[in-house]
A protein has these predicted regions:
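Non-heme Fe(II)/2-oxoglutarate
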Residues: 56-148
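Short coil turns that delineate tetratricopeptide repeat
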Residues: 1, 30-34
Length: 201
């Protein structure tokens, strides 16, 4: 049972038994190379063990990037668009606390996948990120590793949510089991972060 094997790998990690966790994760990946949870368990096991393969699997310098989204059709500037998007997203934040069984702590999250939203500014967001996604995929290229091997002919967005953090809010470590590329778009940030003078957040 795949779920039981994943749970066992996580249990070995919790006990600090990296070799046992790595063996299970590698077995799961041999059966399903797109198993995100197994890949995350393997990366964690290699990191705990000090295995040099961790640096190849999690090549932050090559795989992490910063991009500015495009101005979608219908808006005269990115600033104008982001102002409208911020207002539209704020209307969707109807909850008063973070959702249970999610990674958010100290804030709210939209309960609806933004792909289902009907506000023009929200639907335009997916147009605005197409260019950066294509640029990112081109930059990382293809290769035999677990990540680049999936950089094939196309992509599609599976889900998107808006998070609004309160002071001292944060995310706990988590995995996106269905997503190959994960990203965050900062629509609005506090002045202390936006001015670039410190490393708050």
């Amino acid at each position: 049972d795949v779920a039981a094997r994943r749970a066992l790998a996580h249990a070995w990690l919790a006990l600090g038994e990296a070799p046992e966790a790595a063996a299970i994760a590698q077995d799961l990946l041999s059966r399903s190379p797109v198993d995100q949870e197994a890949a995350a368990a393997l990366a964690t096991a290699w990191r705990l063990a000090g295995d040099a393969r961790y640096r190849d699997l999690c090549d932050y310098a090559a795989l992490v990037g910063v991009h500015t989204i495009d101005t979608p059709r219908g808006w005269t500037s990115l600033t104008t668009y982001l102002d409208e998007l911020r207002g539209a997203l704020n209307e969707l934040h109807v909850l008063r606390a973070h959702p249970i069984e999610q990674s958010l702590r100290g804030g709210t999250q939209t309960s609806q996948n933004l792909l289902m939203a009907d506000h023009p500014a929200v639907t335009a967001f997916f147009q605005a990120v197409e260019g950066p996604i294509r640029a990112y995929r081109q930059a990382i290229g293809q290769g035999p590793d677990l990540f680049r091997a999936r950089n094939g002919a196309g992509h599609r967005v599976l889900g998107a949510w808006s998070v609004r953090l309160q002071p001292n809010g944060f995310h706990v470590d988590h995995i996106h089991p269905q997503g190959w590329i994960s990203s965050a778009c900062y629509v609005d940030v506090p002045a202390a972060i936006g001015d670039g003078e410190d490393h708050a957040g």
